[in-house]
């Protein structure tokens, strides 16, 4: 029987519910249990795929092509599992599906209501998360804050699931804030008490409370929270602010959080607590010596969460070299051919990540040109690959008006063009080339030495692709197409062998990087950047 754990949050948003859920998932996985995890988002968008990065941050893509919340990236990196489309459920997706059923007549003319129709749809998606993965435990984070009107249907659904499945199969974890009042010199439990009171008013009694705090929680404070919130004293867990997110699983383990959950849900773990690998990772993070500076050239840099997985992947790639990665955030709208040398003078490597739209694209092209001409390690992802081919066509071949058809529909030289299967698609949401696809690596290339495999699989999110009409011209002038789809039709990787490191890919390798297992192309980029730094 699959067990279900629900993680809610109170007092304020951004408490770290996602990190708490991911950390618990890691602890249970290390005990030999099969874990999956999902996020309920109360917004009415069907998915974040068409949302502005300024609004939502990064869109994280799963193997099966779901466009999801960035928290799923935390889940995958912490627990070291690959999630699926059932791992992110939005209110928009739920309502959309219910309304489609109503239009089809599935409800036989009945009145469609939040209870039972919306709540039943939510519960169905809960169960699918477990069934699709054959998990022992499903951990579900409820987005928003307890009491928010948007999340009430989700709260009601997880209340009902306890009756549906039995109390022994369901557990509620509530995250709260314990604020420190500087003038009084003490921490206050009242916000936590009121948050739990609100949750209980909605029919849910938490089994475990995780308290976010700046300072150590005294036993008296734990006893007080346990008394007023009606839970066991041992079930009040402290989660202190930490220098590294990777400290959190160890914090929770020291307070026996995994043992409490295992006992409460009558789980049968295969192993005792095993955190040697995680402790080694944390020791590595805490012993980094020196830094490598990477210039990240993008147009959403004012909200760094827009590139969250890219930054995390860079950090992972620095660990084997015991180096901290310092990201220099460069707004591509401010980069020109005239100032690019000054802006990028101090960086050890240049990365142009994915993106959409014409705005600020010329600044990215200027940065790519600087990297190519000055032999600075360059790594392009998605749009970063597309613009690398545009820059090469313009400045090496001499096709001055070359561009991407996405960015300039009237260009006489569409180096990047719409995928054939995208020609007649009008909707924006969910219509990109999404998910895991194979890539064939050309023997003897830098890509070959990076991956050491003839075929790899990587996650994609794009609508435009390199135009093969220009392949011979670019190859004749020194660009190598080192990765393609197995049929050779779609370009997946390009490189310039005359440079020490100039590699770009159409896929998004950042979605498969892990802190204990850096993604190969990121690791190679960081190694090249380190060599460049040492050669200065």
UniProtKB/Swiss-Prot annotation:
CDD domains: CTPS_N, GATase1_CTP_Synthase. One of its GO terms (molecular function) is CTP synthase activity. It catalyses: UTP + L-glutamine + ATP + H2O = CTP + L-glutamate + ADP + phosphate + 2 H(+); L-glutamine + H2O = L-glutamate + NH4(+); UTP + NH4(+) + ATP = CTP + ADP + phosphate + 2 H(+). Residues 1-267 are annotated as: Amidoligase domain. GO terms for cellular component: cytosol. The keyword Metal-binding applies. This is CTP synthase. It comes from Staphylococcus saprophyticus subsp. saprophyticus (strain ATCC 15305 / DSM 20229 / NCIMB 8711 / NCTC 7292 / S-41). The gene is pyrG.
């Amino acid at each position: 029987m699959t067990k279900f754990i629900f993680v809610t949050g109170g007092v304020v948003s951004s408490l770290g519910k996602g990190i708490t859920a991911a950390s618990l998932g890691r602890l249970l996985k290390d005990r030999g249990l099969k874990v999956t995890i999902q996020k309920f988002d109360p917004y009415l968008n069907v998915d974040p795929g068409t949302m502005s990065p300024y609004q939502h941050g990064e869109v994280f893509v799963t193997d099966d092509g779901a466009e999801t919340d960035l928290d799923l990236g935390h889940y995958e990196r912490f627990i070291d599992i690959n999630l699926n489309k059932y791992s992110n459920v939005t209110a928009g997706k739920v309502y959309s599906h219910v309304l489609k059923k109503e239009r089809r007549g599935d409800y036989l003319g009945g009145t469609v209501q939040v209870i039972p129709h919306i709540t039943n749809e939510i519960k169905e998606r809960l169960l699918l998360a477990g069934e699709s993965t054959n998990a022992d435990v499903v951990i579900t984070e409820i987005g928003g804050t307890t009491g928010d009107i948007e999340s009430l249907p989700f709260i009601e659904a997880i209340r009902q699931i306890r009756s549906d499945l039995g109390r022994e199969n369901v557990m509620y974890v509530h995250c709260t804030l314990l604020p420190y009042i500087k003038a009084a010199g003490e921490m206050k439990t009242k916000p936590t008490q009121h948050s739990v009171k609100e949750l209980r008013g909605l029919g849910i009694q938490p089994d475990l409370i995780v308290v976010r705090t700046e300072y150590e929680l005294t036993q008296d404070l734990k006893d007080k929270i346990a008394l007023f919130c009606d839970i066991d004293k041992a079930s009040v867990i402290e989660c202190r602010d930490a220098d590294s997110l990777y400290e959190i699983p160890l914090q929770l383990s020291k307070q026996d959080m995994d043992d409490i959950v295992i006992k409460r849900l009558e789980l049968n773990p295969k192993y005792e607590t095993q955190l040697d690998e995680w402790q080694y990772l944390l020791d590595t993070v805490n012993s980094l010596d020196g830094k490598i500076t990477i210039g990240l050239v993008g147009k959403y840099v004012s909200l760094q969460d827009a590139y969250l997985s890219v930054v995390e992947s860079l950090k992972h790639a620095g660990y084997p070299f015991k180096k901290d990665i310092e990201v220099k955030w460069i707004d591509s709208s401010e980069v020109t051919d005239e100032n690019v040398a000054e802006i990028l003078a101090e960086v050890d490597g240049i990365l142009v990540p994915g993106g959409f739209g014409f705005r600020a694209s010329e600044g990215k092209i200027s940065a790519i040109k600087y990297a190519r001409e000055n032999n600075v390690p360059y790594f392009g992802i998605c749009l970063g690959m597309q613009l690398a081919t545009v820059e090469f066509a313009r400045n090496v071949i001499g096709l001055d008006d070359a561009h991407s058809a996405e960015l300039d529909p009237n260009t006489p030289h569409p180096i990047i063009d719409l995928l054939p299967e995208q020609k007649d698609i009008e909707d924006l949401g969910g219509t990109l080339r999404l998910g895991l696809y194979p890539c064939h690596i050309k023997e003897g290339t830098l890509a070959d030495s990076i991956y050491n495999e003839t075929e790899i699989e990587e996650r994609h999110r794009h609508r435009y692709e390199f135009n093969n009409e220009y392949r011979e011209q670019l190859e004749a002038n020194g660009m190598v197409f080192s990765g393609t789809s197995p049929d050779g039709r779609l370009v997946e990787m390009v490189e310039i062998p005359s440079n020490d490191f100039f590699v770009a890919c159409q896929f998004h390798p950042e979605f498969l990087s892990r802190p204990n297992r850096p993604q190969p192309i990121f690791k190679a980029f960081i190694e090249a950047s380190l060599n460049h730094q040492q050669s200065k």
